[in-house]
Curated annotation (Swiss-Prot):
InterPro entries: AIG2-like_dom, GGACT, GGCT-like, GGCT-like_sf. It comes from Methanocaldococcus jannaschii (strain ATCC 43067 / DSM 2661 / JAL-1 / JCM 10045 / NBRC 100440). This is Putative gamma-glutamylcyclotransferase MJ1514. One of its GO terms (cellular component) is cytosol. The keyword Acyltransferase applies.
Length: 120
C-alpha cells in the first residue's frame, strides 16, 4: 500500500474522487510540509520549484492498481510527475505521500495553496 496526497479533482467532492478513490482508505486532511506553487489552467497543478504556499489536500491509502490508475489519469511520467513529499496531517502526524507535480508554471496562481479557494 502507498499513500497519495491529492489536492485537486481527486479530493472528496470533486469530479474524479468517486471514480478513482471511493474505495480507498481516507487517512486525513493535511498540507505539504514544504512550500510549492499551485496554479489553475482549467485543472489545478503544483509546481515544485516555486516556494509560495503549503499545498492543502487529502491523503489516501491506495493499492498498486489504484496508484496505476491515478498515474494514467495524471499522465505520469509524461505530463505530471509524482514524487514523495512530506505531508503534515491536521492531526499533527507527518507522513510521506506521493504528490503529482507539473514541470512548469502557467495559469492562475492560487496563493493559498487550496484549490477550494480558486474562483476562476
Amino acid at each position: 500500500m502507498e499513500y497519495v496526497f491529492v489536492y485537486g479533482s481527486l479530493r472528496k467532492g470533486f469530479w474524479n474522487h468517486e471514480p478513482y478513490l471511493k474505495n480507498s482508505k481516507f487517512i486525513g486532511k493535511g498540507k505539504t510540509k514544504e512550500k510549492y506553487a499551485m496554479y489553475v489552467n482549467i485543472i489545478p497543478y503544483v509546481v515544485e520549484n516555486e516556494k509560495i504556499s503549503h499545498i492543502v489536500g487529502e491523503v489516501y491509502e491506495v493499492d498498486e492498481k489504484t496508484l496505476k490508475r491515478i498515474d494514467c489519469l495524471e499522465g505520469h511520467p509524461d505530463y505530471y510527475r509524482r514524487k514523495k513529499v512530506s505531508i503534515i496531517l491536521d492531526s499533527g502526524k507527518e507522513i510521506e505521500a506521493w504528490l503529482y507535480f507539473y514541470p512548469e508554471s502557467c495559469g492562475i496562481l492560487v496563493e493559498s495553496g487550496d484549490y477550494k479557494d480558486y474562483r476562476g
